[in-house]
């Protein structure tokens, strides 16, 4: 019930970065954090919040290439609040461990969080090699080094028969 994310876990995947906003059950303070999940144990539950009763995840995304989006946070109207909406860029938040508390986003009650814009990767490019023996591209360092590629980069492969392929 109430599943936020389902995905295939890749061992030693350091590029998948999770962005999250949660409300602490005890204080009501909203925290923002970015984290990578290096390893997991099967059939074990991990608490991504502080662990206090009543804590709730308000926003969650999984980014396979470390993208950092910009969110718009709308606060519930209160008498002393002047600014009811503000933007927060996940690129300004450091990538920490899964068990970290995170940074304080706001101490006020949040009405809703919406995605303003999808960001670009905050990680370095992937290093790609071509292995002529198996005729494949790889990230393991086997074969001839082609270069470092970003998420939006494409590789043009031209074959002997004149055909080509973008990958």
PLM regions and their residue ranges:
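C-terminal interaction appendages of subunits in large macromolecular complexes
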Residues: 1-167
């Amino acid at each position: 019930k109430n599943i936020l994310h389902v995905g295939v876990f890749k061992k030693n995947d350091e590029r998948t970065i999770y962005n999250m906003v949660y409300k602490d059950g005890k204080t009501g303070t909203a925290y923002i954090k970015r984290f990578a999940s290096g390893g997991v144990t099967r059939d074990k539950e991990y608490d991504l919040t502080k662990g206090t009763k009543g804590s709730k995840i308000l926003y969650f995304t999984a980014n396979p290439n470390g993208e950092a989006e910009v969110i718009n946070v709308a606060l519930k109207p209160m008498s002393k609040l002047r600014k009811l909406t503000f933007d927060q860029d996940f690129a300004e938040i450091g990538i920490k461990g899964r068990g970290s508390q995170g940074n304080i986003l706001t101490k006020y009650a949040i009405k809703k969080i919406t995605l303003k814009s999808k960001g670009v990767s905050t990680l370095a490019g992937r290093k790609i090699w071509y292995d002529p023996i198996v005729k494949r591209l790889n990230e393991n360092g086997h074969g001839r080094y082609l270069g470092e590629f970003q998420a939006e980069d494409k590789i043009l492969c031209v074959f002997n028969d004149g055909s080509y392929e973008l990958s």
